[in-house]
Regions:
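Short glycine/serine/threonine-biased micro-segments
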Residues: 49, 55, 74, 104, ...
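Residues located in well-ordered beta-strands
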Residues: 58, 70, 84-86, 123-127
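C-terminal boundary and immediately downstream tail of ABC-type ATPase nucleotide-binding domains
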Residues: 64-88
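Non-catalytic connector elements of ABC transporters
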Residues: 78, 89-184
Length: 184
């Protein structure tokens, strides 16, 4: 598996496999547990969960329109944040109109942004920050068992233990029913 290679060699090997695929113009089946390999090498991906096909599609179809929570969390790095929208948690965590049934909302880390007071949909305490140069990966506790990851602009002035307000880009949320099936 490519995961046994160091990062630079792994990227170079993926490029070589992609070139070979293009040159041969042949159908190739590549089996991997690494979603980055799947996203970068495949024209179409079959996502399996315990031997059951969850979804088939292009990398961008799976990323933008996951059919269920399993695919939503599997495709993308860092993975999609999933928040329950029921009862007290629904009213205390999020201020949006959600379906009348028990549901979950999924938001990808890159769709979050720091919000001004009053316009936020979420509030949480920053537990850890990874500065990756081009962006910050912020690990934010929303209370109880809810922790999310937000990929924020590196110019954001955020500190560990700070309580911050978050919003997300409109139309980038995904809703799932209590069984994990997309209800968008």
């Amino acid at each position: 598996p490519l995961s046994n290679l160091d990062a630079a060699l792994r990227v170079q090997t993926r490029i070589e496999i992609a070139k070979l695929h293009s040159q041969l113009t042949a159908t190739m089946i590549y089996v991997t547990h690494d979603q980055v390999e799947a996203m970068t090498l495949a024209d179409r991906i079959v996502v399996l969960n315990n031997g059951v096909i969850e979804q088939v599609g292009t990398p961008i179809e799976l990323y933008n329109s996951p059919k269920n929570q399993f695919v939503a969390e599997f495709i993308g790095s860092p993975k999609m944040n999933i928040i329950d929208l029921e009862g007290e948690q629904k009213s205390s965590l999020i201020n949006i109109q959600a379906p009348n049934q028990s549901a979950k909302i999924g938001i990808r880390p890159e769709h979050f942004r720091v919000a001004s007071n009053g316009s936020s949909k979420l509030q949480g305490t920053v537990r850890h920050i990874e500065n990756l140069g081009e962006h910050l990966l912020c690990y934010i506790n929303l209370g109880k068992d809810y922790e999310i990851t937000a990929k924020l602009d590196v110019s954001s002035e955020i500190n560990i233990s700070e309580v911050i307000q978050l919003d997300w880009q409109k139309n980038h949320e995904h809703f799932f029913n209590s069984s994990g099936i997309s209800i968008n």
